[in-house]
């Protein structure tokens, strides 16, 4: 599973943050590891320099073997909260997707 993390100019994308988010994704999505080929994480601050509530965005794009990509997004007051909420959404979608595949 390849992980790529992207940030806009308003969200800190230092090496420590990238390593942290990569490790969290590997831990949270470990049971799907054999089905996921790539994960792209996009962080952004939709208000830029201005202050706003829930203006930090985390978009997760997951590429599965022989399937269409799955995309989930969340907004929160910090990139960390948006990330964790997006990961929870993603786990629900992946569970649902693989349950449907098992039924066929």
For the regions a language model picked out, list residue spans one by one.
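N-terminal, polar/charged subdomain of small-to-medium soluble alpha/beta proteins
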Residues: 1-104
């Amino acid at each position: 599973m390849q992980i790529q993390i992207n940030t806009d100019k308003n969200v800190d994308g230092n090496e420590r943050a990238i390593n942290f988010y990569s490790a969290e994704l590997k831990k949270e999505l470990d049971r799907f590891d054999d089905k996921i080929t790539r994960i792209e994480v996009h962080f952004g601050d939709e208000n830029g320099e201005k202050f706003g509530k829930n203006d930090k965005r985390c978009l997760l794009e997951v590429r599965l073997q022989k399937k269409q990509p799955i995309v989930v997004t969340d907004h929160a007051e910090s990139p960390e909260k948006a990330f964790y909420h997006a990961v929870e959404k993603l786990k629900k979608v992946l569970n649902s997707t693989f349950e449907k595949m098992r039924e066929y």
